[in-house]
Amino acid sequence: MERELRLGIMGGTFDPIHYGHLVTAEAVRSEFKLDKVIFVPAGNPPHKVKRKVTDKKHRYLMTILATITNPFFEVSTIEIDREGYTYTIDTIKEFKKIYGEKTQLYFITGADAVLEILTWKSADELLKMCNFVAATRPGVEGNRIDEELNKIRKLYGNVIYKVTVPSLAISSTDIRERVAGGRPIKYLLPESVERYIQKYDLYKKDEENGV
């Protein structure tokens, strides 16, 4: 009998994408023997309304450049093609339509995001539709994460997996601030992405790039 397809879904603003994202995706892919990981750059994320997000075309192309050398990575335009705010529940429903209801989806998120997952739109439905993988990050208290995971298990009977990934203290915010301040970003992200940022002068001006 043919094995069910196992897909990792990694959503994010990717403004810009960096090695922390890539290391996390590969660690989860290996841990759960996923057929592939699909990166989903956010279109108009409701939680980023306080900061102007870089144009979706730039974020999409940077994600392509960062993932193109890994045959198990793909990039989807499913959210950047959608009008209005983009919510995870809508994205998961779309992937279920595309790949079939039997496909096992593993939504990859930072462990810190688990602390807010019950506030997400249609959280109860979302928790039933896909598996969640919480990747531990530097600076996040393990006890708080475990408490939240236990609470979700009791409420929904849903197991959220926790995966420890190599500790890379890299953030998109720091990269944007470094570029704006004229500081180096080498070795924080793929060289192809660094060249793209330089070519299009991204993150240089607050009013244009939302730094």
Curated annotation (Swiss-Prot):
The EC number(s) this enzyme carries: 2.7.7.18
Disulfide bonds: none
GO biological process: NAD biosynthetic process
Pathway: Cofactor biosynthesis; NAD(+) biosynthesis; deamido-NAD(+) from nicotinate D-ribonucleotide: step 1/1
Recorded GO MF terms: ATP binding; nicotinate-nucleotide adenylyltransferase activity
Keywords: ATP-binding, NAD, Nucleotide-binding, Nucleotidyltransferase, Pyridine nucleotide biosynthesis, Transferase
TM region positions: none
Entry-linked Gene3D superfamilies: HUPs (3.40.50.620)
Catalysed reactions, semicolon-separated: nicotinate beta-D-ribonucleotide + ATP + H(+) = deamido-NAD(+) + diphosphate
Family that this chain belongs to: Belongs to the NadD family.
Record HAMAP family: NaMN_adenylyltr
Function: Catalyzes the reversible adenylation of nicotinate mononucleotide (NaMN) to nicotinic acid adenine dinucleotide (NaAD).
Protein name, as recorded: Probable nicotinate-nucleotide adenylyltransferase
